[in-house]
């Protein structure tokens, strides 16, 4: 399911953790490779390789975590999400440019 993810991803990201995301979620449309680490769940070794790489390269993991934190707080904060709900419920049109696809929710 495109863009499906547990809300834990946003919680970890918002708390400054380096997140590892299955490529099948297609969250690459929302977060770049500089903001999250993507792995291929079809390749049983890929996740382990990436975990080991970032354990050995902590500064790189910290850089990605910082970038993800900044993106999360800039593009997906409580004010923007609340504004989005109000746009759908009341305005029936976007009042700002959102960082996620919106066309299926507006007439």
Labelled PLM ranges:
Residues 1-10, 20-24, 28-29:
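Nucleotide-sugar-dependent
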Residues 2, 36-37, 51, 71:
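Short, flexible active-site loop motifs that bind/organize anionic cofactors or intermediates
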Residues 6, 37-43, 54-58:
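Conserved acidic donor-binding segment of nucleotide-sugar-dependent glycosyltransferases
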Residues 15-17:
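A short alpha->beta transition loop at the rim of the catalytic pocket in nucleotide-sugar-dependent
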Residues 24, 41-42, 77-78:
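An acidic- and aromatic-residue-enriched active-site/binding cleft used to recognize and process polar
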Residues 45-107:
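C-terminal amphipathic helix plus adjacent low-complexity
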């Amino acid at each position: 399911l495109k863009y499906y993810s547990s809300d834990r991803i946003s919680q970890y990201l918002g708390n400054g953790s380096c997140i590892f995301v299955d490529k099948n979620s297609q969250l690459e449309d929302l977060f770049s490779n500089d903001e999250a680490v993507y792995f291929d769940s079809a390749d049983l070794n890929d996740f382990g390789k990436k975990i080991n790489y970032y354990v050995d390269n902590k500064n790189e993991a910290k850089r990605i975590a910082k970038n993800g934190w900044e993106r999360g707080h800039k593009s997906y904060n409580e004010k923007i999400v609340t504004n989005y709900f109000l746009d759908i419920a009341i305005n029936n049109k976007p009042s700002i440019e959102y960082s996620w696809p919106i066309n299926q929710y507006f007439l």
